[in-house]
Amino acid sequence: MHVDHTDSQKALRRELRAYFSSLMTPEIREATRGNEGGATYKQVIRQLGKDGWLALGWPKEYGGQGRPSTEQLVFFEEAQLAEVPLPFVTISTVAPCLIALGSDEHKRFFLPKIAAGELHFAIGYTEPGAGTDLASLKTSAVRDGNDYVINGNKIWTSSAEAADYVWLAARTDQDVKPPHKGISIFMVDAKTPGFSFTPIRTVGGVRSNASYYDNVRVPASMIAGELNGGWKLITSQLNHERVGLAAIGVQGWGLLARTLKWAQDTVVGGKRVVEQPWAQSALAEVYTRLEAMRLMNWRMAWQLDSGEPDPAFASAMKAYSTECLIAVDKLMLEVTGMAGGYRRGSPGAALAGDLEEHYRKCQINTFGGGVAEVMRDLVAQFGLGMTGYSRR
């Protein structure tokens, strides 16, 4: 494992930094803040697609640049630092599943549109009674001629308001044991009659949705992979999602740089905050945690280039990185004091309120893609060889 950037990675980082600097004007940044929909968001995504960035790590035969995962990580890091909105679920989780396990027909239809920034997915997994124990999901899909009729409801269907399709897990065999063997993945057109959603507002201001399926008819040809083979797709998709969620840790570096600048410029009790031993200790711990996360991210990217991500390490990385962001935000809020807790638009808000906003937003990442408790179970089972158990 090479822990320093190669010349190619350094060149890519410089290119991306310059590109994002011109793409993300202050007006576009404000219009797309926390918004995974709307005209400006779609305009930015299409521009990214037109310029060839959305399929950076895909094989060339599917319209990608064929770059390794390490260079794709460079892309995500620079995008996070520049606050570029990305259709993360679509390009980083659904598309890799289609490339690895999708039919030729699905690849031909979906991948070019995803690469162009013209088609977006939402994920339909979690239900009110099936989150951590996803295999117990109740949403049903019953064969009727050439279609399946889907009934049920989902929760935490993020980006449903902007999605063209939903990557939906539904039960196609009610009797099989164990129950995860009776699940299939459907690609549901969001314009299909009977599909609807209502918004859920989270503490961080990020929108999610509850979604509903009332006799939604989906062609049998829109099953991804094999009938009753959805669990393999789910686990593959979640491993990619966990890797991607881990990569958001680079957000902490931008906040650290701004917090350090604030501490250098702010005087309390006749001394700059940065000269206070307690502030130095807190900022040093932030740096240490973020640097550890960065190295783990690069190991994960290296694993992806070597094959499928190790489920134990992917789970460990996801748990560590999402909890690490909360921890470092708390430390930086201690350094900034009361001013750090003021919201955006408030007079005297440190970092223009961005630190406070990020602290609220990053909470959701601890359970998106699998709650931290389950991540630890997976580490114990696949990494330490311990016996798995049912939470029922």
Protein language model features and the residues they cover:
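C-terminal helix-coil-helix/basic helical segment that borders enzyme active sites and/or dimer interfaces
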Residues: 28-35, 264, 268-273, 277, ...
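Hydrophobic, small-residue-rich alpha-helical packing segments that form membrane-like cores
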Residues: 130-133, 148
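Glycine-rich phosphate/cofactor-binding loops in nucleotide/flavin-utilizing enzymes
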Residues: 2, 70, 74-75, 93, ...
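Internal helix-loop-helix
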Residues: 50-117, 159-165, 290, 304-312, ...
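Glycine-rich beta->alpha junctions and the first turn(s) of the following alpha-helix
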Residues: 3-5, 195-292, 365, 381
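A short core secondary-structure module
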Residues: 146-147, 151-196
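Active-site beta-strand/loop segments that form the cofactor-binding cradle
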Residues: 24-88, 116, 124-129, 153-155, ...
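A structural signal for short hydrophobic beta-strand segments in well-ordered beta-sheet cores
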Residues: 139-142
